[in-house]
Amino acid sequence: MISTRAHGFQRLFTGMMGLLITLTAAASKPAPLPPEQADGWSLRQEVDNVRIYTMEREGSSFEAFKAVAELDVPIENLMAVMINPESCKEWVHNCIESYAFGQGSFQERYAYSVNDMPWPVTDRDYVLRIQTQGDATTGEIIMTLNAMPDMRAEFNSRVRVDRSDTHYRFIPEGERTRMVWVQHTEPNGALPGWLVNSLIVDIPVKSMQALEAVAKHNRYQNHRLQWGDDGQLQGVAPAGR
């Protein structure tokens, strides 16, 4: 009985952390994310090819995290995954529903997603604005994700999360890609900061490892980046198009 109960609590806490990491929403006046190269980052853990750093944030009980990984896939594969509005279910831990909505473009588009929570915690949903930009000179691609919680009606069976900032940067290194993921979240509900901060490592590690594996699937092979005359990224398409 003790073992079963402990397992239940572990799954509950892991589910809560999945919410904090994958739900990417912005407050009306969010504090800016700490820069990637800020002095305050402290290495928290290194798991295989993923390194997790954390940093305390002034006025917040919750730490920011930075995850850095050397992924053994080319940037074209990764971007083919990232532009798929349903790919959240493939690589983001605990994401069970995801789809695009609205009249978006490659540079600015919208998605709705649901994060599975273990009973008795209610599933969380979120509405995202996803902005993507790339520079042909460096080959780097940056994605920022912020919530627009009022763009879609809420469901009684789900709780909408409305505060977080996320930044992805993809740096091509030949047939490999360096990925940097920075996030700071102020979660809804009465979750103590000490608990969240103690579990902040697990979810980004699992998600980035899954992303590397998913990007090797056949459906994400043989894509190319489409650059405009101004050197800005315009889209991602199969190589034959």
State where each predicted segment sits.
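Bacterial N-terminal signal peptides that target proteins for export
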Residues: 2-16
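Bacterial N-terminal signal peptides
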Residues: 14-24
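Eukaryotic helix-grip
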Residues: 28-241
